[in-house]
Amino acid sequence: MLRAVARCCGHWPPGAAAADGMLWQTELRPHAAGEFSMAAAQANLAMEDQAQVLASPAATLVGVYDGHGGADASRFLRSRLFPHVQRFEKEQGGMSTEVIRRAFGAAEEEFLQQVRQAWRQRPKMAAVGSCCLLGAISGDTLYVANLGDSRAVLGRRVVGGGVAVAERLTDEHNAASEEVRRELTALNPDDAQIVVHARGAWRVKGIIQVSRTIGDVYLKKQEYSMDPVFRNVGPPIPLKRPALSAEPSIQVRKLKPNDLFLIFASDGLWEHLSDDAAVQIVFKNPRTGIANRLVKAALKEATRKREVSFRDLKTIEKGVRRHFHDDISVIVVYLDRHRGRRHTRVVDSSSNCTNAPVDIYSSNSGQSVETLQAHRGSGW
């Protein structure tokens, strides 16, 4: 059991590198209820997205972690979230919303400890965070938990027809939403700056668009943002209470025969494709390479908006690419079999884990991740 979790939190399997060295995909792989497909595209100098699937005969875990301010928090989640889920699931004897809530809380607390330990040497760690999207399929029950603006969408067949419709399964915690702005204002009635329109978007404290994350300690604990050490990172930020939350939104539903597939993806995909467009692509095309097809559809839309060709995009280096699109991570999970068994365990001795590369460019170019991390001075 522990070896399976260790494999999941370690190296990625060999994937199919596209001609574009910033793309990655892997072949179709089995999970408890069918098959899944994964793909990713790098835009940032350091890949800030991370994605993984842990599959056993009993159940499936899916994780998409969209980092910001650096890759530390998303890489941390890649290595630590699933073990926390596994630990609490074992303690409680099955999957539940409480297991997921405790796993998110434990991950947040553990990352805070990492920030404390690195504070004097790397104060920038306090300004690093990540969105966190978790899916768990246990028997015929689906759990989806979310912090931030990554998204899970269900493709569902219309009863009596050959048409698929999209159903969004996540609440997005982004200040672009009027509901989120109202929530922030209600929680902070004495803070006129809790949500500000700055640099073309609504932002919490005029800084960050997402309102719930793992990390971003400087917007949760004033002792970090007001410490003189933090002045090397940014201006002091007075806080009467945490501006951001790590409390996930959790949805639970019973899977039905008309539920065809799930799409889990970072907002790098959704800023270019609608829920319905993504569902139609998956519904109308072969399974092989389907996640990569979604990534390429988003990239083509991004290039159309920027009035450059997709061929030209392939020549643009990492870092510069961020002006055209964000990092993109996509996992498509097909729902072929709905087992009615209850209290199934998430991890067992025959579990298999698939991770997207920590950094696509270094993976495709042959540069070791260890070398890349040493060059950046990363702690992960």
Curated annotation (Swiss-Prot):
Its cofactor is Mg(2+); Mn(2+). The keyword Hydrolase applies. The keyword Cytoplasm does not apply. It is an enzyme of class 3 (hydrolase). It catalyses: O-phospho-L-seryl-[protein] + H2O = L-seryl-[protein] + phosphate; O-phospho-L-threonyl-[protein] + H2O = L-threonyl-[protein] + phosphate. Mn(2+) 1 binds at residues 66-67. SUPFAM superfamilies: PP2C-like (SSF81606). Its EC number is 3.1.3.16. This is Probable protein phosphatase 2C 34. It comes from Oryza sativa subsp. indica. The lineage of its organism: Eukaryota, Viridiplantae, Streptophyta, Embryophyta, Tracheophyta.
